[in-house]
């Protein structure tokens, strides 16, 4: 195993570390006064996810959703693996093109785009983009008339944790009119896309969306369009404790594709996985910078049923304005793990964990049983790769954590590609 540690804009490769070892090594290099928060990212985990994807969804080409985590090393790893990229803005297109990704491996998958961003996509050679209404077609007709448009349809995402169809997607009953207007505008519609939302607990939503896509596909073909792209969107789980497993979703998708889109050399099937690739690859380490004892409470929670003399409030140096913005915007539920080795029969106390800012909203964990922690000790949070680093701010002057990289089982060609990437 290797660990890659970024030092300003350079990287150095060390031998013999996994994620946990890297965390402990980095922490041992800090004193309590210097314990800034940091991530350890296992790029090898991303590679293993890719291998699982190819095994479970062999007909579907992944176009990684850049919005989920736009870290340079993540993008470089995925580019070396040959994935495509789902971009939502000119900046994301620029970022991906900047590491050498060709425009044909980019889909501009934002149904509602700023005109200047459409122009940037055109000038960058990015032709494939999504839309869901006639007004978007009119913008494209004026700005990028040679674009290859993919019609996004709405889905039943009522069981998803993060719902998207309330904002994006044309209703199936409206698609014929939209396609007819595209024909009048001489816009080339090449396929259909959808997104079932993130955190869904019902894999059958993919089956229904694929069935609806077939209906719209045939509608487009009837109107004279060369329909050859099916984009099944995102919503694939990436954490260890996901209630709906990726393999189960893949099985439903494969059955639906076999029924509605049997193998065809002219057909391209893509998806937009984000959290699937990166969620479990990142672990965040935060330092306990302050603590308070709170009045005792009577608890009755399974094995912890007892009258506790005290509970604790812990303050750490990252919060909801930083990496834990996922709690506010992605409905994440995080669990703190003490970095130190557990002590046998150590008493656990009801605890809350708070971020470092002056805002009372900055609470990371409302209630969790932990051993008593001391100022200067560390808490770890696993599965922190999705919608974390991309949403950080510098509110109150707190900066984003540094990312250190573990490389476990990475192929040589990926390592070479990473070394050639600029930070």
Curated annotation (Swiss-Prot):
Annotated positions binding substrate = 329-330, 359
Q: What is its EC number?
A: 4.1.1.17
Which positions does the record annotate as the modified residue N6-(pyridoxal phosphate)lysine? 67
SUPFAM superfamilies in the record: Alanine racemase C-terminal domain-like (SSF50621), PLP-binding barrel (SSF51419)
Q: Which domain of life is it from?
A: Eukaryota
Summarize where pyridoxal 5'-phosphate binds, as residue positions: 198, 235, 272-275, 387
Signal sequence, renumbered to the chain: none
Alphabetized, the UniProt keywords read:
Decarboxylase, Lyase, Polyamine biosynthesis, Pyridoxal phosphate
Q: How is its activity regulated?
A: Inhibited by antizyme (AZ) in response to polyamine levels. AZ inhibits the assembly of the functional homodimer by binding to ODC monomers and targeting them for ubiquitin-independent proteolytic destruction by the 26S proteasome.
Under the GO molecular function aspect, what terms does this record hold?
Answer: ornithine decarboxylase activity
| Catalytic residues of the enzyme | 358
Essential cofactor(s): pyridoxal 5'-phosphate
Q: Name one GO biological process term.
A: polyamine biosynthetic process
The protein's assembly and partners: Homodimer. Only the dimer is catalytically active, as the active sites are constructed of residues from both monomers.
Protein name per UniProt = Ornithine decarboxylase
Task: Give the organism, scientific name.
Answer: Trypanosoma brucei brucei
């Amino acid at each position: 195993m290797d660990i890659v540690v970024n030092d300003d804009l350079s990287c150095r490769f060390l031998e013999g570390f996994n994620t946990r070892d890297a965390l402990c090594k980095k922490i041992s290099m800090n004193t309590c006064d210097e314990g800034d928060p940091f991530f350890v990212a296992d790029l090898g985990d991303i590679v293993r996810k890719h291998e699982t994807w190819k095994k479970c969804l062999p007909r579907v080409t992944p176009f990684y959703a850049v919005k989920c985590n736009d870290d340079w090393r993540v993008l470089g790893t995925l580019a070396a693996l040959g994935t495509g990229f789902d971009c939502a803005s000119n900046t994301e297109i620029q970022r991906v093109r900047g590491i050498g990704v060709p425009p044909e491996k980019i889909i501009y998958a934002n149904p509602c785009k700023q005109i200047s961003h459409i122009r940037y996509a055109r000038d960058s050679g990015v032709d494939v983009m999504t839309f869901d209404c006639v007004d978007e077609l009119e913008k494209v007709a004026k700005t990028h008339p040679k674009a290859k448009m993919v019609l996004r349809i709405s889905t039943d995402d009522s069981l998803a944790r993060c719902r998207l169809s309330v904002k994006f997607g044309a209703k199936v009953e409206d698609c014929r009119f939209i396609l007819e207007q595209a024909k009048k505008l001489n816009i080339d519609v090449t396929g259909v896309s959808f997104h079932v939302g993130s955190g869904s607990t019902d894999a059958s939503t993919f089956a229904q969306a694929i069935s609806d896509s077939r209906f719209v596909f045939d509608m487009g073909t009837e109107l004279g369009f060369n329909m050859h792209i099916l984009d099944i969107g995102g919503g694939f789980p990436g954490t260890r404790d996901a209630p709906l497993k990726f393999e189960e979703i893949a099985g439903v998708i494969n059955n639906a594709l076999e029924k509605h889109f049997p193998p065809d050399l002219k057909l391209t099937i893509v998806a937009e996985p984000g959290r699937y690739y990166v969620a479990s690859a990142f672990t965040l380490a935060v330092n306990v910078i302050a603590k308070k004892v709170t009045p005792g409470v009577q608890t009755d929670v399974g094995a912890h049923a007892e009258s506790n003399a005290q509970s604790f409030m812990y303050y750490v140096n990252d919060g909801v304005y930083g990496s834990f913005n996922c709690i506010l915007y992605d409905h994440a539920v995080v669990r703190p793990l003490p970095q130190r080795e557990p002590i046998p029969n150590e008493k656990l106390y009801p605890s809350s964990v708070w971020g470092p800012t002056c805002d009372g909203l900055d609470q990371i964990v409302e209630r969790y049983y932990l051993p008593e922690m001391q100022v200067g000790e560390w808490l770890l949070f696993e599965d922190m790769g999705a919608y974390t680093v991309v949403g950080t701010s510098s509110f109150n002057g707190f900066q984003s954590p540094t990312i250190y990289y573990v490389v476990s089982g990475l192929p040589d060609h990926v390592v070479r590609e990473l070394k050639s990437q600029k930070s």
